[in-house]
Structure formats: structure tokens, C-alpha cells
From Swiss-Prot:
Matching PANTHER family: NAD(P)H-QUINONE OXIDOREDUCTASE SUBUNIT I, CHLOROPLASTIC (PTHR47275:SF1)
Domain (4Fe-4S ferredoxin-type) ranges: 55-84, 95-124
UniProt entry keywords in alphabetical sequence: 4Fe-4S, Chloroplast, Iron, Iron-sulfur, Membrane, Metal-binding, NAD, NADP, Plastid, Plastoquinone, Quinone, Repeat, Thylakoid, Translocase
Protein's organism: Polymnia canadensis
Record protein name field: NAD(P)H-quinone oxidoreductase subunit I, chloroplastic
Alphabetized Gene3D superfamilies for the sequence: 3.30.70.3270
Membrane topology: Peripheral membrane protein
Cross-referenced NCBIfam families: ndhI, NuoI, PRK05888.1-3
Role of this protein: NDH shuttles electrons from NAD(P)H:plastoquinone, via FMN and iron-sulfur (Fe-S) centers, to quinones in the photosynthetic chain and possibly in a chloroplast respiratory chain. The immediate electron acceptor for the enzyme in this species is believed to be plastoquinone. Couples the redox reaction to proton translocation, and thus conserves the redox energy in a proton gradient.
Predominant cellular place of this UniProt entry's protein: plastid
Annotated Gene Ontology cellular component terms: chloroplast thylakoid membrane
Length: 166
């Protein structure tokens, strides 16, 4: 008789403990119900990137002196600089400049060490394509400035995200 009573008491204690755990989990769920959502609806809402965000590289062809500092400081020797030495003025003339963003690690060394500031980082981060060869940008593609997220009227920008409390 006693083993049956103790089993019944253990079953009751386990039931109460399980109900308490379920209640605790439900209270956590309810505490999150009155908070703002953490995620954004990406194609229709975009976050404003910070000032120091390292996105696609912008290149100004007229400022470049073909010194190749960007190639030397790049950890993967990525920028391709084609130039021709003009003997009459004894200066290099830039012919072609290209960067393959399929390989680029966006470290920003080329921008930081450029002596003429012809390279800069933009806020553009949507570089996805169906063909990886489309990620090889020449000086014309690098010279285009991206459309600012703030200026795009089709997208609702998110200025202030709720801060996560730890």
C-alpha cells in the first residue's frame, strides 16, 4: 500500500513541477510580448548604416595617380591597376582600375592608405548577383555612387532600433 501512495505523491510532485516550468516559460513569452520587434522586414525596411560602415568601394578616376599603394596594402593583392608611363611628362597615366568584390574582404586598407583619397567606402551592401563575374567592377562601375537609403522613397528606413538590455 505504501509504495502506491509514494508513487502517487511523486506523480503529483512531478505534475506540479512540470506546471511550474510551463508557467515560467509562458511568463517569459508574455514579457516579450510588449517589446518592439528585433527583426526588420528586409526588402521593405532597411537600417541606416553607421558612418564607419565598410561597404562597396567608390573610386574617383581623376584623382588616382597610379601609385599602386592600394595593391601593396591589400592583404590579398586585389585591386588591378593598369597604367602607362608617359615619357614626355615622366608620370604614370592610369588606364584601367578594377576590383573584384567576390574576393574582396572589405578590410578598408586601400581606402585608409590611399595618398590622394580617390577611394572611399560607401554604404552600399547589396552586391548579390547570379553570376560571380558580375562582381568584378571596373573604374566606371566603381565610379557610380550608390543611391542613398535615405533618398529611396520606396523603402521605409529604420533610424532608431531598440537597444538590447543585457
Amino acid at each position: 500500500m505504501f509504495p502506491m501512495v509514494t508513487e502517487f505523491m511523486n506523480y503529483g510532485q512531478q505534475t506540479v513541477r512540470a506546471a511550474r516550468y510551463i508557467g515560467q516559460g509562458f511568463m517569459i513569452t508574455l514579457s516579450h510580448a510588449n517589446r518592439l520587434p528585433v527583426t526588420i522586414q528586409y526588402p521593405y525596411e532597411k537600417l541606416i548604416t553607421s558612418e564607419r560602415f565598410r561597404g562597396r568601394i567608390h573610386f574617383e578616376f581623376d584623382k588616382c595617380i597610379a601609385c599602386e599603394v592600394c595593391v601593396r596594402v591589400c592583404p590579398i593583392d586585389l585591386p588591378v591597376v593598369d597604367w602607362k608611363l608617359e615619357t614626355d611628362i615622366r608620370k604614370k597615366r592610369l588606364l584601367n582600375y578594377s576590383i573584384d568584390f567576390g574576393i574582396c574582404i572589405f578590410c578598408g586598407n586601400c581606402v585608409e592608405y590611399c595618398p590622394t583619397n580617390c577611394l572611399s567606402m560607401t554604404e552600399e551592401y547589396e552586391l548579390s548577383t547570379y553570376d560571380r563575374h558580375e562582381l568584378n567592377y571596373n573604374q566606371i562601375a566603381l565610379g557610380r555612387l550608390p543611391m542613398s537609403i535615405i533618398d529611396d522613397y520606396t523603402i521605409r528606413t529604420i533610424f532608431n532600433l531598440p537597444e538590447i538590455k543585457s
